[in-house]
Design a protein with these regions (language model features):
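N-terminal secretory signal peptides that target proteins for export/translocation
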Residues: 1-13
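Bacterial N-terminal signal peptides
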Residues: 16-27
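N-terminal periplasmic/intermembrane-space "pro-region" immediately following the signal or transit peptide
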Residues: 30-112
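Outer-membrane beta-barrel pore domains
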Residues: 49, 170-175, 195, 203, ...
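Outer membrane beta-barrel
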Residues: 93-124, 128-247, 267-285, 350, ...
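Loop-centered beta-sheet repeat module
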Residues: 248, 253-298
Length: 446
């Protein structure tokens, strides 16, 4: 082989090796440096970044909402409010929901369904004339809003008999201190055992007491303002409200005189209040009053002055439940009222009305159930109501306006928020027109 051939062969080998080395080196360098960056479109990048920020903000909002719902569900952050503290503010358990919230919206409610069965005959043996009735009696929603630790809005909207809507109360509270506050709006008159505490899981019996229907006409609410407070074991409420619309009074009681907040006539105002003492948990007793004119300009110089006073008490201890109330109402200018309305004989408005009741119950499961467990409470109730206790001179009373009620029944609470009540009521009066009843009530509160 010639020298030239040898040199050409070696040159070709060197060139081939160099090319192979270059080809292998370029991909390795490319892998080490990554892909060649592409110059971004500035418009597209801005839109994508804005969309990403919006999605992140939405995700944060969803997370916050989920946390808030979980907090509400679990009750985390609620303010502790004992039964005694709620009662001192005139609040039944469900109505107190807004006062347990730290801030913001609260929703609660209650309802009841009532079956009423009537005897075939009256006390004197004549036909009863009434057929059984099954009523979606009440469905209520409480809506409240705590603006801060001082200001609170509390409202109750009620549907009665499945079709009648009412604003039961609506007021704004200002808590000046922990133990004293101001209240204004459509207020529950602070009288008796039931008017402020009318939830079916609270009062005993399938129906509210007749004394707190005819004389203290619950649920009784009027427009006004006032104060409330509690010191140690004493609590009070004192309001000024519009007076009754007395032209609706009758021989059957004062119930028709309620104005319920609807364009209430306020020529006559009234003062109402109560004071209660709670010596030990589960026990309280006190008195309440109402005083004001009721004519609202319809009787000339007469103002149809109306005064109602009651004494009441409740003892719940070791499974026993004792409740009692006595109420008396006095009406001035009854003669002027009767003449103006052409009422004669036994149809006239009385100068004095009175009524009272005693309820005794015992939870037979109290010694075996834990707190918040099932409760089964048989009870008896004795009640007397007289809407013509004293008549003006020249008028006589009706024998049917003095009624005695004897009731025996039971209530069963599988949980504190649900109650089933069953009772039988015997009704008698001097007119022998009493008609016995058998009632069943299903109630709830939340």
């Amino acid at each position: 082989m010639s020298l030239l051939s040898v040199l050409m062969k070696r040159y070709f080998c060197l060139l081939t090796g160099f090319l192979v080395a270059v080809l292998l080196a370029v991909p390795a360098a490319s892998l080490a440096q990554g892909p060649t960056p592409v110059e971004p479109d500035p418009v597209t990048t801005g839109e994508e970044e804005a969309e990403e920020e919006e999605q992140e903000d939405l995700a944060r909002r969803v997370d916050l909402l989920a946390e808030e719902l979980e907090r509400l569900r679990s009750g985390e952050g609620e303010i502790e409010l004992t039964d005694a503290q709620a009662r001192a503010r005139g609040l039944a358990p469900s109505a107190a929901a807004v006062f347990r919230a730290n801030q913001g919206l609260s929703i609660a409610g209650y309802g009841e369904f009532l079956y009423e069965g009537y005897a075939d005959t009256k006390q004197n043996g004549s036909p009863g004339g009434k057929i059984p009735q099954f009523d979606a009696l009440r469905a209520i929603i409480y809506t409240g809003y705590r603006f801060n630790d001082k200001w609170v809005l509390n409202t109750e909207v009620e549907i009665e008999h499945a079709k009648e809507a009412y604003l039961e109360f609506a007021y704004v509270d200002y808590a000046a201190t922990e133990n004293f506050g101001f209240r204004g709006g459509l207020l529950l008159v602070p009288m008796g055992l039931v008017n402020e505490f009318h939830e079916p899981t609270v009062f005993m019996g399938t129906e509210r007491p007749f004394t707190e229907n005819k004389i203290i006409p619950s649920t009784w609410r009027e427009n006004g303002a006032g104060i409330y407070g509690a010191w140690d074991k004493v609590s009070f409420r004192l309001y000024t409200v519009n007076g009754f619309k007395g032209e609706k009074f009758s021989s059957k009681g004062l119930r028709g005189g309620r104005q319920k907040g609807y364009k209430a006539k306020a020529d006559n105002m009234a003062t109402t209040g109560r004071i209660d003492i709670t010596p030990t948990p589960g026990v309280f007793f006190g008195t309440s009053f109402y005083k004001g004119g009721s004519a609202q300009g319809t009787l000339g110089d007469a103002d149809l002055g109306t005064t109602i006073v009651d004494v009441h008490g409740q003892v719940q201890i070791r499974g026993f439940d004792f409740r009692g109330l006595y109420a008396k109402a006095n009406i001035d200018d009854a003669v002027a009222f009767n003449k103006a309305n052409n009422l004669e004989g036994s149809n006239g408005l009385a100068e004095e009305l009175e009524g009272g009741y005693i309820i005794i119950g015992y939870n037979v499961l109290s010694q075996t159930s834990d707190i918040g467990g099932p409760a089964f409470t048989p009870y008896i109730k004795f009640e007397r109501v007289d809407t013509q206790a004293s008549m003006p001179v020249g008028y006589n009373r009706s024998l049917s306006t003095l009624n005695n009620f004897r009731t025996i029944g039971f209530e069963f609470k599988p949980i504190p928020n649900v109650v089933i009540k069953v009772d039988h009521m015997w009704v008698t009066n001097k007119a022998n027109s009493g008609l016995n009843q058998f009632n069943v009530n299903l109630g709830y509160g939340f």
